[in-house]
Regions:
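Hydrophobic, small-residue-rich membrane helices and short re-entrant helix-turn-helix hairpins
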Residues: 27-40, 111-114, 189
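Helix-boundary and loop/linker segments of multi-pass membrane transporters
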Residues: 30-32, 80-81, 158-160
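Hydrophobic cores of alpha-helical transmembrane segments in multi-pass integral membrane proteins
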Residues: 39-112, 116-150, 162-185
Length: 193
């Protein structure tokens, strides 16, 4: 029977302040530089947009329950169908994995204490919210009926005037995803010993 000798054991000290015991004020959440909190901010906002897209999907399914146009007219159905696609693609599907898991889990997996550019990381979330507010404003102003792809004949000739606003919302959300993806994790990777 052998025994294992423990040499140089160091006690692990928890940091004084981290995302679990830091102040829980609104200011501390909206001005945070902690990558875990930014990941949670992305999670909460993406869940909000998922609920909006799910509401449009429920309206579509309720309309398709019977052959008659019970709930919406044809134009309103096209708007609900398009807004469901726009919200679910640009504000749920594209940012969900890189923004939430990339901010919360990736730095922990590679051993980094934080992301390389924490202010840029928080700025990307603010841009995502800014683009999402354009998407919600598009919905409140009547939506678009072009589909989520914004094909040219539908978006130029046969559409209402909200296509530019919806396109700006998608562009700003896409730019936010570029900023989220450009946050470099490898510069702060833990060194191998």
């Amino acid at each position: 029977m052998s025994t294992i000798a423990q040499h140089g054991t160091a006690e692990h000290k928890m940091p004084r302040e981290h995302f679990l015991n830091a102040a829980y004020t609104v200011k501390s959440w909206f001005l945070t530089m902690d990558h875990k909190r930014v990941g949670l901010l992305y999670l909460f906002s993406i869940c909000f947009f998922f609920l909006i897209g799910g509401t449009f999907a429920s309206l579509i399914r309720l309309e398709l329950a019977t052959p008659e146009a019970d709930l919406m007219e044809a134009d309103q159905y096209n708007v609900a169908f398009s807004m469901h696609g726009i919200v679910m693609i640009f504000f749920f599907l594209i940012p969900s994995i890189p923004a939430v898991f990339g901010n919360f889990i990736m730095p922990l997996m590679i051993g980094a204490k934080d992301v390389a550019f924490p202010k840029l990381n928080l700025t990307s979330w603010y841009l995502f919210i800014f683009g999402g507010s354009f998407g919600v404003l598009t919905t409140l102003l009547g939506g678009v009926d072009t589909g989520w792809t914004f094909y040219t004949p539908f978006s130029s000739t046969y559409s209402n005037s909200n296509v530019i606003l919806a396109g700006m919302a998608a562009f700003i959300a896409g730019f936010s995803s570029i900023l989220t993806g450009s946050v470099s994790y490898t510069h702060l990777r833990a060194h191998e010993t």
